């Protein structure tokens, strides 16, 4: 009987200890919404307190430049790990023509930097948001506005996406992205003249590669990603030729695209460590 009572007491103590551990876990912070412009989509949801000890991280969602996608869960996840997270929306192709999307991201980065007392933020973008993230890190003097950039499945070359989507046997996702890229450019390479080609060239992050003036880059795809790893390989090669040494590419197993890449083995840990190292 005594042994039974001791066992019950021990189980109760373990359950109490486990409950205390759960209660002590950090609570994901709620977000506060701010506007960085007059348009309804020009807003930022901030997670986590502002502090000199918390690096700022700007998140740019994907959605083929045509729709919003929800990154609030990951924003809270990063905030719980010591970042002040700025989950940023921007005008879509239904709202305004290119380069409005890039203009919005640059305006948002200026707003964040002002709020952070002049400190440059880190940037994390996914898919179409990855395209805007690498644009932010390469357009002009990217390093002056973004401390470093992580891009998950970045559509670094919308023209490549357009060409891949028109190839025989192209997947549904690639065909859809082809149409989205053409809507972003506002013209078809098949029919457009010099102005059209200039816009497609401007859309390619590699066209803006300037080496040491640009932000460090971590570019991640999966082997079966419908946004092929060649997007990032081309950008990385252009940056290395221009003199940027801090550029890394990763290709992981599977067919994950964008945000779900963070759920693949080691990618979450690699991304978090890289961001912290560049804070």
What are these regions (language model features)?
Residues 66-76, 90, 231:
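The serine-hydrolase catalytic nucleophile loop
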Residues 212, 219-221:
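Short beta-strand/loop motif that positions the catalytic acidic residue
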Residues 220, 227-229, 233-279:
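C-terminal catalytic histidine-bearing segment of alpha/beta-hydrolase fold enzymes
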């Amino acid at each position: 009987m005594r042994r039974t009572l001791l066992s019950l007491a021990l189980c109760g103590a373990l359950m109490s200890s486990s409950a205390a551990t759960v209660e002590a876990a950090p609570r994901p912070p709620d977000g506060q919404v701010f506007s960085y412009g007059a348009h309804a989509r020009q807003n930022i949801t901030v997670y986590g307190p502002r502090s000199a000890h918390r690096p700022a991280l700007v998140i740019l969602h994907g959605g083929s430049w045509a729709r919003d996608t929800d990154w609030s869960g990951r924003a809270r996840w990063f905030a719980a790990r010591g970042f002040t997270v700025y989950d940023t929306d921007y005008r879509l192709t239904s709202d305004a023509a290119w380069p409005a999307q890039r203009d919005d991201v640059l305006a948002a980065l200026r707003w964040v930097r002002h709020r952070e007392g002049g400190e440059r933020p880190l940037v994390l973008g996914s898919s179409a948001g990855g395209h805007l993230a690498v644009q932010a890190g390469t357009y002009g003097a990217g390093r002056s506005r973004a401390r470093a950039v992580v891009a998950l499945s970045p559509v670094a070359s919308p023209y490549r996406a357009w060409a891949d989507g028109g190839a025989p046997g192209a997947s549904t996702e690639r065909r859809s992205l082809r149409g989205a890229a053409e809507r972003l450019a506002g013209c078809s390479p098949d029919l457009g003249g010099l102005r059209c080609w200039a816009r497609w060239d401007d859309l390619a992050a590699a066209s803006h590669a300037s080496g040491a003036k640009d932000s460090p880059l971590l570019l991640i795809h999966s082997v079966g990603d419908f946004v092929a790893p060649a997007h990032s390989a081309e950008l990385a090669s252009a940056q290395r030729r221009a003199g940027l040494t801090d550029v890394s590419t990763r290709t992981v197993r599977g067919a994950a695209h964008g945000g779900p890449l963070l759920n693949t083995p080691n990618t979450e840990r690699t991304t978090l460590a890289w961001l912290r190292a560049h804070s």
